[in-house]
């Protein structure tokens, strides 16, 4: 829902799992949100980060590590990270 100024005013905006595109419900207490920091060519953090959300379903199956690796390899090419 938007107000007259075009700002989002919803009380709850559900997140989606980055790996499966499933909606992460409010009762999914096993879900996590992970920020991965970007580094420069010297290996120093440059203030940027990428956020990934993983549902409890992916974590319960034991696929979180491979899903996060796959997502980061895809995103790394987009942000030109080494």
Swiss-Prot record:
Keywords: Ribonucleoprotein, Ribosomal protein. Gene3D superfamilies: 3.30.1230.20. InterPro entries: Ribosomal_eS21, Ribosomal_eS21_CS, Ribosomal_eS21_sf. It comes from Oryza sativa subsp. japonica (Rice). PANTHER family: 40S RIBOSOMAL PROTEIN S21. Belongs to the eukaryotic ribosomal protein eS21 family. Pfam families: Ribosomal_S21e. This is Small ribosomal subunit protein eS21. One of its GO terms (molecular function) is structural constituent of ribosome. The keyword Metal-binding does not apply. One of its GO terms (cellular component) is cytosolic small ribosomal subunit. PROSITE patterns: RIBOSOMAL_S21E. It comes from the Eukaryota. One of its GO terms (biological process) is translation.
